[in-house]
Design a protein with these regions (language model features):
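A solvent-exposed interaction/effector surface
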Residues: 1-172
Length: 172
């Protein structure tokens, strides 16, 4: 559900990700998290960056012709660390709308995620005075603007968890 609108400063992250199709991508996204947890990449990122928080970075870049977008698992780079293993990702300062949802049953994680996204894209955005800066058909595909997904705890393979989506927006 919609929580509030906030201003965020520019943030730098280190992470890794993949390109995935616009449609039917949730299983790919959750599999990426499962592999990150089992391979210890999340712990490695936390140590390298000096951060306890891990985020999903949704739609940092996209390819409109191929109808794909990126999904990264990343940590805020508080140590300004350099890495050949992980990608440097800069999220521009700006206005973000925050949405929250809780998933309490592992078998409902896709449903829970889709319900929150439906609220964002089908209810809140059409009735608000804002436009998403990652809207693929209009403004999207501008590197530096991405949605941040924060899972608490920072592992969506364990339930219950809270999902917080920070969506970059601007006035219409």
């Amino acid at each position: 559900m919609f929580e509030k609108i906030i201003q965020l400063p520019e943030k730098h992250f280190l992470g890794y990700g993949i390109m995935m199709p616009w449609e039917n991508n949730l299983e790919i996204q959750f599999n990426l998290w499962e592999k990150a947890v089992s391979s210890q990449k999340i712990e490695k990122l936390k140590q390298l960056c000096g951060s306890d928080n891990v985020v999903g970075i949704f739609c940092y870049r996209c390819d409109k012709e191929k109808r794909t977008f990126s999904y990264h698992i990343a940590c805020e780079n508080k140590k300004n660390a350099l890495s050949t293993e992980f990608e440097d990702l800069k999220i521009n300062a700006g206005t973000f709308a925050i949405f929250k949802n809780v998933c309490s049953d592992f078998s409902d994680r896709f449903k829970s995620y889709n319900e929150l996204c439906a609220e964002v894209w089908k209810q809140w955005l059409p009735s608000s005075e804002h436009i998403s800066l990652i809207e693929l058909e209009t403004f999207g595909c501008v590197e530096g603007y991405a949605s941040l997904e924060i899972y608490t705890p920072d592992n969506p393979t364990v339930v219950p968890y809270q999902l917080e989506i920070l969506l970059p927006i601007r006035k219409k």
